UniProtKB/Swiss-Prot annotation:
EC id: 3.1.-.-
GTP-binding listed as a keyword: no
Recorded domain comment: The C3H1-type zinc finger domain and C-terminal region are necessary for pre-miRNA binding. The C-terminal region and proline-rich domain are necessary for oligomerization.
Organism this protein belongs to: Bos taurus
Region (Disordered): 1-29, 73-119, 262-290, 323-404, 503-530
Cellular component per GO, a single term: rough endoplasmic reticulum membrane
Protein name from the UniProt record: Ribonuclease ZC3H12A
Length: 583
């Protein structure tokens, strides 16, 4: 190959030139571009990356730049949410479709605004609060600030404090004021308002600031914060009186802590949260279920919920009778007629009793007594199971051991069941009426107490003992006092360990022969009446004994032998009891 050809080949291939070193500016630009590409892969825009790199510098660490980008991105997101796009893009629709409606942006008020709008306006008696915080010796403006801050922390925005304008004057030894600058600060925030006052002839003329407070709170349907009851203003207007009773929020200061009560209107009123709201959040005062359940012995006085007895009246039987005694006779009679319940003996499907199966005469008696009044049904219900009370005119019959077996509480009439709720005494009186009284000796069954002592049931027979004869004579005479020779032995009923235990049953005794001659009062009822009158009096006596002590019932019914209305008798018993308090 010739030299000329070799030079031509070199000229065609080109001779390599030495590489030139990049400048510092080019290196910086390349590094910047590399970092921008790296952060763009993470989802950040070029503008955000350039602003952060310009702030931190190109030599900043990758973690530092990434942290700043995260902060910058969250701030931009908040700004984007705060100012939504006024012209949102319309959604794409297929060809031929209708014109899409522009989406409406629903603006919801902030949660704090909704919370504040539901709260009542607050009107604070500044003088009362300041003097209370100063222990009634110093006008402590710090107390006003504590009260205002307490309501501001709860979300209240409408707060007004009234203070007389003369409190802006320089304090004097006789009128000490502390932290007076707080009044000016609250006035600048438009929370505190000074009531007008001026000097006339060297004397200070002060407007009545209490009237400002009550008037503004009444017109704005707000809350008055004060320990003053404003008695003078209650007498001016009736609506102000009602408003002050329902909207006055009292308070206490525990050192520097403002403490209003959790129950501003008492333990049965609304809570503090609902008291300060225009609409209560939840329904309150849901009673908790009673922990004792069906074993509860408090009756209607129990403050817990008893779902097993939903139809219980809210008032006791005594309160019902007292209320009925104050009603006119016509309204009381209609109310008593509506409140009566059907007796268990009138329910369908009841088994025939023993006396209906053994004697046709007894069947006739039952047929005659069946269409009677509800009082007769109540009286028959009170009789022992399987027995019926014959009319008072029947002289035959006697008492037997089967008549002394107690009833269950379910078989009691409703009047007796209601009075079990009135306490321990009424329960024991019911038990004593059910089991009766034993007298004469350990083996002799004594006559029962109560209005049924004069009646004889179909069964065994009793001897004419002196105690029984004396008791019969006492019944025939028209009163129920037990004679002196009638003394029940202490061994008749063993003592009970607990009051809730029932009396133990007496031991069964053998049936004795019927006395030859009935007592002089055997053909008459307990009060000397006969037939329907005696039954009605017995029924009324049973009802009243469930409410009042038996001796009071006997005394009043003996004074008014022809009076059978329970409401009138209850009124007479109350009157008699008030006149004989020493008994």
């Amino acid at each position: 190959m010739s030299l000329w050809e070799l030079e031509d080949r070199r000229s065609c291939q080109g001779t390599p030139r030495p590489a030139q070193e990049p400048t510092a500016e080019e290196a910086t630009t390349a590094e910047l571009q590399m970092k921008v590409d790296f952060f763009r892969k993470l989802g950040y825009s070029s503008a955000e990356i350039h602003s952060v790199l310009q702030k931190l510098g190109i030599q900043a660490d990758t973690n530092t730049v990434l942290g700043e980008l995260v902060k910058h991105g969250s701030a931009a997101e908040r700004e984007r949410q705060a100012s939504p796009d006024p012209c949102p893009q319309l959604p794409l629709v297929p060809r031929g479709g209708g014109t899409p409606k522009a989406p409406t942006v629903e603006t919801y008020p902030p949660e704090e605004d909704k919370e504040g709008s539901d709260l009542r306006p607050i009107v604070i008696d500044g003088s009362n609060v300041a003097m209370s915080h100063g222990n009634k010796d110093v006008f402590s403006c710090r107390g006003i600030l504590l009260a205002v801050n307490w309501f501001l922390e709860r979300g209240h925005t409408d707060i007004t404090v009234f203070v007389p304008s003369w409190r802006k004057e320089q304090p004097r030894p006789d009128v000490p004021i502390t932290d007076q600058h707080i009044l000016r600060d609250l006035e600048k925030k438009k929370i505190l308002v000074f009531t007008p006052s001026r000097r006339v002839g060297g004397k200070r003329v002060v407007c009545y600031d209490d009237r400002f407070i009550v008037k503004l709170a009444f017109e704005s349907d707000g809350i008055v914060v004060s320990n003053d009851t404003y008695r003078d203003l209650q007498g001016e207007r009736q609506e102000w009186k009602r408003f002050i009773e329902e909207r006055l929020l009292m308070y206490s200061f525990v050192n520097d802590k403002f403490m209003p009560p959790d129950d501003p209107l008492g333990r049965h009123g609304p809570s503090l949260d609902n008291f300060l709201r225009k609409k209560p959040l939840t329904s309150e005062h849901k009673k908790q279920p009673c922990p004792y359940g069906r074993k509860c012995t408090y009756g209607i006085k129990c403050r817990f919920l008893h779902p097993e007895r939903p139809s219980r009246p809210q008032r006791s039987v005594a309160d019902e009778l007292r209320a009925n005694a104050l009603l006119p006779p016509s309204r009381a009679a209609s109310k008593d007629k509506n409140s009566r319940r059907p007796s268990p003996s009138s329910q369908p499907g009841s088994l025939p009793t023993e006396h209906e199966q053994c004697s046709p005469d007894r069947k006739k008696l039952g047929a005659q007594a069946s269409p009677g009044t509800p009082r007769e049904g109540l009286m028959q219900t009170f009789a022992p199971t399987g027995r019926s009370l014959p009319p008072s005119g029947s002289s035959g019959g006697s008492f037997g051991p089967s008549e002394w077996f107690p009833q269950t509480l379910d078989s009691l009439p409703y009047a007796s069941q209601d009075c079990l709720d009135s306490g321990i005494g009424s329960l024991e009186s019911q038990m004593s009426e059910l089991w009766g009284v034993r007298g004469g000796g350990p083996g002799e069954p004594g006559p029962p107490r109560g209005p049924y002592a004069g009646y004889c049931t179909y069964g065994a027979e009793l001897p004419a003992t002196p105690a029984f004869s004396a008791f019969s004579r006492a019944l025939g005479a028209g009163h129920f006092s037990v004679p002196a020779d009638y003394a029940p032995p202490p061994a008749a009923f063993p003592p009970r360990e607990y009051w809730s235990e029932p009396y133990q049953l007496p031991p069964p005794t053998q049936r004795l022969q019927e006395p030859q001659a009935p007592g002089p009062g055997a053909d008459r009822g307990p009060w000397g009446g006969a037939g329907r009158l005696a039954k009605e009096r017995a029924s009324v006596y049973t009802k009243l004994c469930g409410v009042f002590p038996p001796h009071l019932v006997e005394a009043v019914m003996s004074r008014f032998p022809q009076l059978l209305d329970p409401q009138q008798l209850a009124a007479e018993i109350l009157s008699y009891k008030s006149q004989h308090l020493s008994e």
